[in-house]
Amino acid sequence: MYAVIKTGGQQFKVKQGTILKIEKLEIEPGKKVTFKEVLIVSDGDDIQVGTPFVSKVTVEAKIISQGKGKKVHILKFRRRKHSMKQQGHRQLLTEIEIVKINA
């Protein structure tokens, strides 16, 4: 059984036990979170596609940790001016484990 959930402007295909890194959620590690925006649910040959979401289906997950992603380096170089600007960014992420798909 798998489901496709929407969180943080992205879509993820999840199964029970899947570990994901998603956009930061303001929830402490160890707590549970429920995703109600489920786009697709599949149980073998039975597939339910939502318009836009499947009704009465939720996905429960447990927060494992909060952290940051890999650093992205940005370099703006101005030709013939002997000038450049260097910057970095690390996205805040939440690591979750899918506990249960309630279909």
From Swiss-Prot:
Alphabetized PROSITE patterns for the sequence: RIBOSOMAL_L21
Cysteine disulfide links: none
Keywords carried by this UniProt record: Ribonucleoprotein, Ribosomal protein, RNA-binding, rRNA-binding
HAMAP family the UniProt entry points to: Ribosomal_bL21 (MF_01363)
Protein name: Large ribosomal subunit protein bL21
One MF term in the entry's GO annotations: rRNA binding
UniProt GO cellular component terms: cytoplasm; ribonucleoprotein complex; ribosome
Protein task: This protein binds to 23S rRNA in the presence of protein L20.
Membership in a protein family: Belongs to the bacterial ribosomal protein bL21 family.
InterPro entries on file: bL21-like, bL21-like_sf, Ribosomal_bL21, Ribosomal_bL21_CS
GO BP terms, alphabetized: translation
Oligomeric and partner information: Part of the 50S ribosomal subunit. Contacts protein L20.
Gene of this entry: rplU
